[in-house]
């Protein structure tokens, strides 16, 4: 179902999703405990999608929930994701790149399974969460391998079909790129936005996006990233939390 602007309407609009954002919600508590770095990333993405949703007229609560839980499947193997690793540990160093690809890509199916099992997440929200990588290539592992077929290193999910799914994909990609650029001391919000969206478009991930919506998203994210630039998105506390857990 869509509204007059072609945006999808939540099949359970009367279903209040705000309680899923409470810090005491059991699944969120488990996610935050097992994946401190990923949960912080998810909260940052949540702030981005919330701001974008407001200007696009989307359900900002649903979008924020989808952002908070889009990576919850990483709980199955948290140490394999860089945001949850300490500086001196990376289990991928000793693995074949394709094995690493299989491990990382599995979090999409794991996310779907966890959210379906929870029973409080409507199906359209689960779809948004599980389309956030589309068929993107894991360039790091592909470049590390000697494989010539990049399709072997693509996520095997569906490309985003709705404005909500595309917004989450864009915000997730931009948050990850911003974090990396900040850590390397070369963060420029406008460059991050333009290059990230251009890469997604060139790879065919945003084929369903309307030009007008895309411009609105760029402008909204520019404001969000300017604020993040002042605060310098930082995952050091999450790393400290991990280190403290190891020492207990």
Question: Model-flagged regions — what are they?
Answer:
Residues 1-32, 248:
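Non-catalytic interface/linker regions that flank or bridge core catalytic/transmembrane domains
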Residues 6-8, 53, 62, 244:
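Low-complexity, compositionally biased segments
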Residues 10, 15, 22, 156, ...:
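Regulatory/sensor and coupling segments of signal-transduction and defense proteins
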Residues 11, 20-21, 144-150, 154, ...:
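Histone-fold modules and their flanking histone-like tails across chromatin and transcription assemblies
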Residues 28-41, 46-190, 199-203:
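Divalent metal-dependent catalytic cores for phosphoryl transfer on phosphate-bearing substrates
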Residues 201, 205-248:
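Long, hydrophobic alpha-helical segments that serve as membrane-spanning/inserting helices
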